[in-house]
């Protein structure tokens, strides 16, 4: 296939390489308490994503990403917490948000298991990454002499998440942090497709984890307990 016959595709390819899958991100924080009442200890924080049978849930890999991005050993793995609290955090019975937690914690068995685990702070993550737009086309052929793909495809994705920090002991919301990232990915192809990916979910994870680190590092007040 003669590339000179397709200047439009070559121009789009050059544009895609120049843009390089750019991502724009926004982080916002609303603090409803001046500071944590008690500094986080080992295993005293759990990060949970929304899970429910209605098909809407926060991706487990995003929750894992945030947990692993937080420095230190204060974070209890989500899976370990869910297993210890079985069956109350399974998809069919899990709370839909922090507003449902007081009712759940009124159950003495639930409260005791959480206390035994030593978990003080719950970070509830709600949100998802979605494809918002896509355009272009690509055609691939296979022949005895070889094959290849020709075309240009773009797609835009938006990663939007909100983390609510909840004190399980005082049963109050300490603050909320939102992380939004959006970007456009490109896949030009002249024989071989070359994906140029905008990693919006990774950017949203990094921004949310960094802000949570700052939030959780705020000096604890003296009236801890």
Where do the protein language model's features map onto the residues?
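Bacterial N-terminal signal peptides that target proteins for export
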Residues: 2-12
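Bacterial N-terminal signal peptides
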Residues: 11-21
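Structured loop/turn residues at beta-strand edges in well-structured enzyme cores
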Residues: 17, 40, 117-120
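C-terminal/domain-edge helix-coil "capping" segments
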Residues: 22-43, 52, 129-131, 150-225
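A structural "domain/chain start" motif
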Residues: 22-104, 115, 214-225
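Solvent-exposed, acidic/flexible segments
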Residues: 55-63, 99, 103-107, 154, ...
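Surface-exposed short loop/turn segments
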Residues: 98-169
């Amino acid at each position: 296939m003669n590339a000179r016959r397709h200047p439009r595709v070559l121009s789009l390819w050059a544009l895609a390489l120049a843009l390089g899958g750019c991502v724009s991100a926004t982080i916002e924080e609303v603090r409803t308490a001046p500071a944590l009442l008690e500094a986080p200890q080992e295993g005293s924080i759990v990060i949970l994503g929304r899970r429910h049978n209605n098909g809407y849930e926060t991706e487990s890999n995003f929750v894992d990403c945030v947990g692993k991005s937080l420095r230190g050993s204060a974070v209890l793995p989500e899976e370990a917490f869910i297993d210890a609290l079985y069956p109350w955090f399974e998809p069919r019975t899990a709370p839909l948000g922090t507003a449902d937690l007081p009712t759940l914690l009124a159950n003495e068995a639930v409260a005791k298991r959480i206390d035994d685990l030593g978990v003080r702070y719950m970070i509830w993550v709600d949100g998802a990454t979605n494809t918002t737009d896509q355009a272009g086309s690509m055609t691939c052929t296979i022949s005895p002499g070889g094959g290849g793909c020709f075309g240009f495809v773009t797609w835009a994705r938006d990663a939007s998440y909100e983390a609510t920090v909840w004190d399980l002991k005082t049963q109050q919301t300490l603050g909320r942090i939102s992380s939004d990232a959006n970007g456009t990915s490109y896949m030009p192809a002249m024989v071989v497709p070359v994906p140029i990916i905008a990693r919006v979910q990774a950017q949203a994870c990094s921004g949310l984890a960094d802000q949570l680190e700052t939030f959780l590092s705020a000096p604890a007040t003296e009236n801890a307990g």
